[in-house]
């Protein structure tokens, strides 16, 4: 599954006006969303040296240098992207605090796109300090969100021979 293709389809189908990209790192989705004309808030706690400074001055992108756990939601969004964010935090923080904040700052019928590595993924087996999530964790949020879609896929680790990343995504819609 190509993430960019999936996110492009979500943007085309739902036409979000305001998007939040949590822990954006390489800004792929931020740039993609801005190219569709959406206003994008980018949240990350590092300066991204891989992209030129002019991206931080893009007219549709606002950059916030914050840690996810310290970010104070102020805006309402149509689409929130959390690619490979949850595995860095305990379930209590993600499922109670962060998902409540997302719910409270996601417009009605807004979409939350979450990805995480599954336990047999190279990233998880080589980083024991990461936290494991599965689909059931997000199904338990049914009082807040409707589970619209989910999928998992495997792809090779480009820097390790005979190793695989096993990743799952969920798409939640605010009721």
Predicted feature locations:
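Class I (Rossmann-like) S-adenosyl-L-methionine-dependent methyltransferase catalytic domain
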Residues: 1-14, 26-36, 40-59, 65-72, ...
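A short glycine-rich, Lys/Arg-flanked "PGG" loop and its adjoining helix->strand segment in the class I
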Residues: 96-108
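Conserved S-adenosyl-L-methionine
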Residues: 23
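Short catalytic micro-motifs in class I SAM-dependent methyltransferases
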Residues: 84-88
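A conserved beta-strand element that flanks and buttresses the S-adenosyl-L-methionine
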Residues: 81
């Amino acid at each position: 599954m190509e993430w960019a293709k999936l996110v492009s389809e979500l943007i085309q189908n739902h036409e979000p006006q305001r998007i939040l990209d949590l822990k954006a790192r390489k800004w792929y989705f931020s740039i993609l969303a801005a190219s569709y004309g959406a206003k994008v808030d980018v949240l990350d706690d590092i300066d991204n040296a891989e992209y030129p400074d002019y991206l931080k001055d893009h007219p549709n992108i606002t950059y916030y240098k914050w840690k996810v756990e310290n970010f104070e939601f102020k805006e309402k969004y149509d689409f929130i992207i959390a690619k490979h964010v949850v595995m860095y935090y305990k379930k209590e923080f993600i499922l109670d605090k962060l998902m409540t904040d997302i719910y409270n700052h996601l417009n009605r019928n807004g979409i939350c796109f979450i990805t995480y590595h599954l336990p047999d993924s190279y990233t998880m087996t080589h980083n024991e300090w990461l936290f494991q999530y599965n689909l059931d964790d997000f199904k338990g949020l049914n009082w807040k969100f409707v589970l619209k879609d989910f999928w998992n896929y495997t792809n090779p680790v480009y820097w390790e021979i005979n190793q695989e990343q096993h990743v799952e995504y969920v798409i939640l819609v605010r009721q």
